[in-house]
């Protein structure tokens, strides 16, 4: 049964871990296709909503802990603009109030998930910078 979405979803920016403050929410990650009754490993991570990222990026540490298998390779560039060959992993992201997504993601040395436009484009995202809150509809 699909999870019921609770929209609109509103949260304050994370002012403790990001300077300047940024739109961050919690996400759970697991192996795609895992049945809920199978006691699968689910890891939680902060997730920065990053409209500058084409695709979602997950921490390498989570790739290792979930033992995700790579499904493809692409050439990707970070903010430095230097292209490099990188693996793509299939992963399930679970947003408690907004639904579940199985996506193709790349890994990085960050300690948090970067939610890219591959997911953000499924929502209407409003950044209220002056109020330091964000809303998803």
Walk through the language-model features, giving the residues of each.
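Pepsin/retropepsin-fold aspartyl endopeptidases
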Residues: 1-137
